């Protein structure tokens, strides 16, 4: 039986959030979908999904964006796992990460939520933290700006220049995890920072 991966990009719904740091996971899914001209469609699990192969002959993917706010992401993720009869080990969550500098990726399997409320809800609803995370660094806010304000704002002009490369690297990391395993992806994409 061929391998199927569920890849979830965390974020908030609506155009007002589309270009914010909190939605970088969904930007990565848009990049993945564009590589094989996959289209997102509404799914009964309260998510929009695109299904297919990103690389011809490569693993099959279900790319999913929950249609909930970040803190309610777990319900759609849990429903998608059940719908596709997948174990959490076949789940890759792409998320923003404050504790990692901008322009940096960190990949890991398992663990806690690290203070990320979207991941916290996924763990609670799935009943396990045993899934892969692609953590895309958005950095801490400057000065005394609240973290919540920072992630809900757009990227700076300097960040926007490098954002396409960061998003493409995160998409490449997802592909490598599915095709070659987490260790191979970590060896390639763990950057200094």
From Swiss-Prot:
Any matching Pfam family: Pept_tRNA_hydro
PROSITE patterns for this protein: PEPT_TRNA_HYDROL_1, PEPT_TRNA_HYDROL_2
Active site: 22 (proton acceptor)
Transmembrane among keywords: no
Site residues (Discriminates between blocked and unblocked aminoacyl-tRNA), renumbered to this chain: 12
InterPro entries, sorted: Pept_tRNA_hydro (IPR001328), Pept_tRNA_hydro_CS (IPR018171), Pept_tRNA_hydro_sf (IPR036416)
Family: Belongs to the PTH family.
Annotated positions binding tRNA: 17, 69, 71, 117
Subunit annotation: Monomer.
Residues annotated as signal peptide: none
Protein name, UniProt field: Peptidyl-tRNA hydrolase
Free-text function comment from the UniProt entry: Hydrolyzes ribosome-free peptidyl-tRNAs (with 1 or more amino acids incorporated), which drop off the ribosome during protein synthesis, or as a result of ribosome stalling. Catalyzes the release of premature peptidyl moieties from peptidyl-tRNA molecules trapped in stalled 50S ribosomal subunits, and thus maintains levels of free tRNAs and 50S ribosomes.
Site (Stabilizes the basic form of H active site to accept a proton) location in chain: 96
GO CC field: cytoplasm
EC numbers for this chain: 3.1.1.29
Keywords: Cytoplasm, Hydrolase, RNA-binding, tRNA-binding
CDD domains, per database record: PTH
Reaction catalysis annotation: an N-acyl-L-alpha-aminoacyl-tRNA + H2O = an N-acyl-L-amino acid + a tRNA + H(+)
GO molecular function: peptidyl-tRNA hydrolase activity; tRNA binding
Superkingdom of origin: Bacteria
Subcellular localization: Cytoplasm
Primary localization: cytoplasm
Any single biological process term in GO: rescue of stalled ribosome
């Amino acid at each position: 039986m061929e391998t199927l991966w569920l890849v979830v990009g965390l974020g908030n719904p609506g155009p007002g959030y589309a270009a914010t740091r909190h939605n970088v996971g969904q930007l990565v899914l848009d990049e993945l979908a564009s590589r094989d001209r996959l289209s997102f469609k509404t799914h009964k699990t309260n998510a929009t999904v695109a299904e297919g192969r990103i690389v011809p002959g490569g693993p099959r993917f279900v790319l999913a964006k929950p249609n909930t706010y970040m803190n309610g992401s777990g319900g759609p993720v849990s429903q998608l796992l059940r719908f596709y009869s997948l174990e959490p080990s076949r789940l890759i969550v792409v998320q923003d990460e404050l504790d990692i500098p901008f322009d940096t990726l960190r990949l890991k399997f398992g663990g806690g939520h690290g203070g990320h409320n979207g991941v916290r809800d996924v763990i609670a609803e799935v009943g396990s933290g045993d899934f892969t995370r692609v953590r895309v660094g958005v950095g801490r806010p400057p000065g005394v700006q609240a973290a919540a304000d920072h992630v809900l704002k757009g990227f700076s002009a300097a960040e926007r220049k490098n954002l396409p490369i960061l998003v493409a690297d995160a998409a490449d990391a997802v592909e490598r995890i599915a095709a070659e395993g987490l260790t191979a992806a970590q060896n390639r994409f763990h950057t200094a920072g």
